Amino acid sequence: MRVCVLYCGNQGNEPKLKELATKLSDGIASNGHTVEAFDMNLEMGKVISFYDYVVVITRAVSLFSKYIPENVLKFLKTAGTVSGKRCSCFISKDSARKSKVLQYLMHVMESEGMYLMVSDVLSNGDYAYAVGKRLHVDSGMKE
């Protein structure tokens, strides 16, 4: 299956999110899937309609905020037909209100019509790899 891993931080280049996306991609690819990772800040306007599964990784705007970067909303609105796509969403652990941030990200993705399967908080690269390896992209579940 073709899997798209999207990540977005506040600035254009955040090494922590890039590491999480890379490790998650490696974990998913170890199951034999074709995986591509993109930075939403740099690839604005990219069409992701032809991917079978979409993964979104982001972080909170600030330490005590529940909001995610505005570019996530803009990207999903201009990404082509994402309604009905099976997807997963993850956030990094560098927020004081992790559950609110994750809940808001789920709300944004579901408002675009995406079918959310798995959501979680990624603490480090090793955990991201383990989650990617155990993520059943075909069924959308996690072991």
Q: Which ranges hold each PLM region?
A:
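FMN-binding flavodoxin-like domain, especially the glycine-rich phosphate-binding loop
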Residues: 2-12, 16-40, 46-143
